[in-house]
Design a protein with these regions (language model features):
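Accessory alpha-helical/coil subdomains and C-terminal extensions
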Residues: 1-82, 88-90
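ATP/nucleoside-binding phosphotransfer catalytic cores, i.e., glycine-rich phosphate-binding loops
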Residues: 91, 95-155
């Protein structure tokens, strides 16, 4: 499932599921399951991925103290077809970067905000907030957006 994360670069126990908890454990040589194995539905666009050169251009921009609009504006000007903002905490986006994101959306470029935090994702938001990636990491949100864009062009 989407909750599984690689937590360490080289340890044998490099993976974890954070707040979701374990799926199972091995006790006395036997597997003890706590819940069913997650099965993600196949995204409609996954079957027609083709060559990576034809994939939509979706970039990740990091929000931080003092973030400027120029990086997001430059990506949109260069032809980005989607933007994911890796926000602080609960997906917070610096004010100047948020204005640029709203400009991108107005120009037809989808934008999603995700959290840079390892666990928790983006929960709750005021009605005027930028669209949320939910519990997806910025990298997962980028892949989802690419698949959404591919599906939209195939339809």
């Amino acid at each position: 499932g989407a909750e599984l994360r690689k937590l360490h670069g080289w340890r044998i126990d490099a993976f974890g599921s954070g707040d979701a908890g374990p799926l199972a454990v091995v006790e006395d040589g036997r597997l003890r399951r706590f819940r069913d194995w997650p099965e993600a539905p196949l995204h409609a666009a996954a079957a027609s991925l083709g060559d990576a050169a034809g994939w939509p251009v979706v970039d990740i921009v990091t929000s931080h103290a003092g973030a400027r609009a120029r990086s997001l504006d430059a990506l949109v000007a260069a032809g980005a077809q989607g933007i994911v903002i890796a926000g602080t905490g609960n997906g917070s986006v610096h004010q100047e970067l948020e204005q640029a994101a709203r400009g991108a959306i107005a120009a037809g470029v989808p934008v999603r905000r995700a959290s840079r935090c390892l666990l928790g994702g983006v929960v709750g938001a005021p009605a005027d907030a930028l669209p949320s990636a939910g519990t997806l990491t910025p990298v997962q949100a980028r892949i989802e957006m690419m698949l959404d864009l591919l599906a939209a062009t195939a339809a």
